[in-house]
């Protein structure tokens, strides 16, 4: 047997236990990150609410987020595809609304706080009231989705997968209502004194009175003004405008 061949076999024999230990360690970490665990759900919600109440400038209408099991199930289904391409909006719809989406892929299981921190780090490119850069290398969409005022439900999932032959971990969060409206993306919330828009429904700088409905038309105020909420079109497609008077929408 050639000496090079022998050295290769020795090196491989030494490497196999290391790889086995790494796989076991990764599996152990992954099992602590699955979003079926109530403590993981609460961690994700708490991180988001902490970031939302700390926006600069402060927000007057920022809603407190809660966990949605239905949104989490949609995220779980999509996470199994291990695809960084945005999912079909119909695949992340809830009964009353559509949901936005943030995605991340790693080569090793990392904490949810680390993943959410990656998304939030886009805040360094964001200036309230200014339109986002058109530079393809600069994005603020994941940050603005995190701090979108009217998003009040969140559901997330993580899935192990393989990408080009290597192990990967795919993280997905769905935010409902959906954020990143192209018309208002430069102002994801209303600037002002915390809870100014919800003085009777406030909890630690966050509003607790979401409108559970969603306007599917962008010009619902005009639709309602000219047709009224008794008309079939506004009644079906402008539910937030018609049914929510004091709630945050």
Swiss-Prot record:
The Gene Ontology biological process annotation of the record reads:
binding of sperm to zona pellucida; sexual reproduction
Glycosylation-annotated residues: 104, 230
Quote the function comment for this protein: May have a role in sperm-egg fusion and maturation.
Among PROSITE patterns, the record links this protein to:
CRISP_1, CRISP_2, SHKT
This protein is called: Cysteine-rich secretory protein 1
**SUPFAM superfamilies annotated for this entry?**
Crisp domain-like, PR-1-like
* Annotated Gene Ontology cellular component terms: extracellular space
Q: Which Pfam families match?
A: CAP (PF00188), Crisp (PF08562)
Please give the family membership noted in the entry.
Belongs to the CRISP family.
Report which gene this protein is encoded by. CRISP1
Q: In which tissues is it expressed?
A: Expressed in all the regions of the epididymis except the caput and is not detected in the testis, prostate, seminal vesicle, and brain.
Arranged from A to Z, the UniProt key words for this protein are: Disulfide bond, Glycoprotein, Signal
Cysteines joined through disulfide linkages? 195-202, 198-207, 211-244, 220-238, 229-242
Q: Which residues cross the membrane?
A: none
Q: Where is the SCP domain?
A: 45-175
Question: What are the boundaries of the signal sequence?
Answer: 1-20
Q: Which InterPro entries match?
A: Allrgn_V5/Tpx1_CS, CAP_dom, CAP_sf, Crisp-like_dom, CRISP-related, Cysteine_rich_secretory, SCP_CRISP, ShKT_dom
Cite the ShKT domain residue spans from the record.
211-244
